[in-house]
Amino acid sequence: MTMRASVPMFYRIKAYGPEPTNMVHIPAGWSDMGNGMDPGEGFVGELPVHSVYAGGFYMDKYEVSSNLWGEVRTYALARGYGFDNTGQAKGPEHPVRTVNWYDCVKWANARSQKEGWEPCYTNADGSIHVTGTFAGGCDWSANGYRLPTEAEWEKAARGGVSGRRFPWADDTIRHALANYYASSATYSYDTSPTSSHHPDYDDQPEPFTSPVGAFAPNGYGLCDMAGNVEEWCWDWYDVDYYASSPQTNPRGPASGPNRVARGCSWSETAKGCRVACRFQELPTFANGSVGFRLVRSAP
């Protein structure tokens, strides 16, 4: 039995405003991380299963759409922000993709400023990060937007249900539930009648994304936590991190070559859609399978 560390309680005066639009409140509490199913079905880095405590936060109900990306990016460019990529999408309500980790950090700051919140990402000198390669830190007490930690993402994806393979209360997956590459002959828990990309969205050319919110939400009310596009997280990736992860608000290793991405995409199989699955990419990486969504710390 894993002993849970005590969680310090404190009172912080911080203006957070009303319940954010199109965001879902994820309550503070304990949840499990890692592959609790058959250890042989997972990838390296998904063990050991361990309990972590995450403070409360709000998460975007949907992956960031091209429409929202463009609106904030236009605001940002007029105020001195610089991005590595313009971002691409199949349509205005499809998830933006072909954005790297650095783009997402700057975009998060711009969205915070646009809406009147405190930016989370600062440079080493304390200035707000708006351009160039990020080498600063995250102000975790700020009330603005930021990328979720890996622990926050998995807690949210589980939807309040423990011990399940996917972001819903069922251990099987099919095209009625998510936009992914079906392969029922390979995975017994893939029950789609076809072995292919999602037939509703495989219109050429790639990528075969679906509009955000096209599938039913999970128990917390979040859409597309499996499939459509992978989602950038804050953490550096370490294959052995789970063996030494803090129990309270883990935020990943101090450094590393790659950042974590979660959630799988339209091009990946059922194995990648499991909530325990961890991906890693260079922070400069950008392609048609990776997008993001943001969070804000809750009071």
Positions of predicted regions on the chain:
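A short glycine-rich, aromatic-capped structural motif
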Residues: 18-80, 98-112, 151, 227, ...
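Cytochrome P450 catalytic domain signature, combining two hallmark sequence patches
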Residues: 74-88, 117, 162-166
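Short, P/G- and charge-enriched loop/turn segments at secondary-structure junctions
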Residues: 1, 38-48, 198, 278-283
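Short, composition-biased motifs enriched in small/polar/acidic residues
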Residues: 1-18
